[in-house]
């Protein structure tokens, strides 16, 4: 699952000061000095992995695809720039959770789901994260679409009321912002990449099989995924 590490700090690593050029620094003095933040982050992560139907489905799908996820190996609670909540580090196959910016369990659940979608894409496809912005755009579209980032409830908390086609608008906007945060490219280039892949990637609902607009939707999707797995196992 690991990729060649980037040689320059051009890929958003400035937002995650504990890693620097794709190298995890889990045991840094900074992490240890902020034990309370780290402990809370680890606890919320465990709850997310154990109880979120979004996360449980993604973990099962990755295991089925040959990419078993281990909490201690593939997740890292770290201090980050104030503008981000998490990230997927393709160079180390790690999900970074920003312990200083995630304070509620519902937020942790969404971040874990969002980043697990990137990890799932990394597992199932030959994603060229560092050189192909269209690949990055596709995964950002899928993550925004399927993670719950753009549910109506979350949009209302952002004071976005009654926008026609709000879900698609939100997905496009969040994908664009995510790309611009981690790539030193123009807005025009990012918009072009999003536009080119939007339809196909927005309609790629794997492994959920649908857009889970709520926790209840995610539970149904998880049940269907388990039943599908049992069906194929009995063939």
Curated annotation (Swiss-Prot):
Keywords: Hydrolase, Metal-binding, Metalloprotease, Protease. InterPro entries: Peptidase_M76_ATP23. The keyword Protease applies. GO terms for biological process: mitochondrial protein processing; mitochondrial proton-transporting ATP synthase complex assembly. Its EC number is 3.4.24.-. It comes from the Eukaryota. GO terms for molecular function: metal ion binding; metalloendopeptidase activity. Signal peptide: none annotated. One of its GO terms (cellular component) is mitochondrion. The active site is at residue 115. Belongs to the peptidase M76 family. This is Mitochondrial inner membrane protease ATP23 homolog. It comes from Xenopus laevis (African clawed frog). The lineage of its organism: Eukaryota, Metazoa, Chordata, Craniata, Vertebrata.
């Amino acid at each position: 699952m690991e990729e060649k590490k980037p040689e320059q700090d051009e890929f958003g690593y400035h937002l995650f000061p504990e890693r620097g050029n794709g190298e995890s620094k889990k045991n840094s003095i900074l992490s240890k000095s902020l034990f309370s933040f780290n402990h809370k982050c680890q606890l919320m992560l465990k709850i997310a992995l154990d109880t979120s139907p979004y996360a449980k489905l993604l973990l099962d799908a990755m295991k089925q695809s040959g990419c078993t996820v281990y909490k201690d190996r593939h997740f890292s609670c770290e201090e980050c720039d104030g503008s981000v909540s998490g990230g997927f580090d393709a160079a180390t196959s790690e999900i970074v959770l920003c312990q200083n910016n995630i304070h509620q369990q519902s937020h942790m659940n969404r971040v874990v789901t969002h980043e697990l979608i990137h990890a799932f894409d990394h597992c199932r496809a030959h994603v060229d994260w560092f050189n192909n912005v269209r690949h990055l755009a596709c995964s950002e579209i899928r993550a925004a679409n399927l993670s719950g980032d753009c549910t109506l409830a979350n949009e209302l908390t952002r004071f976005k009321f009654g926008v026609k086609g709000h879900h698609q608008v939100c997905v496009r906007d969040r994908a664009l912002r995510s790309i611009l945060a981690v790539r030193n490219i123009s807005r025009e280039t990012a918009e072009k990449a999003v536009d080119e892949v939007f339809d196909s990637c927005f309609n790629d609902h794997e492994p959920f099989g649908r857009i889970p607009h709520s926790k209840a939707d995610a539970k149904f999707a998880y049940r269907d995924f388990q039943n599908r797995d049992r069906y194929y196992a009995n063939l």
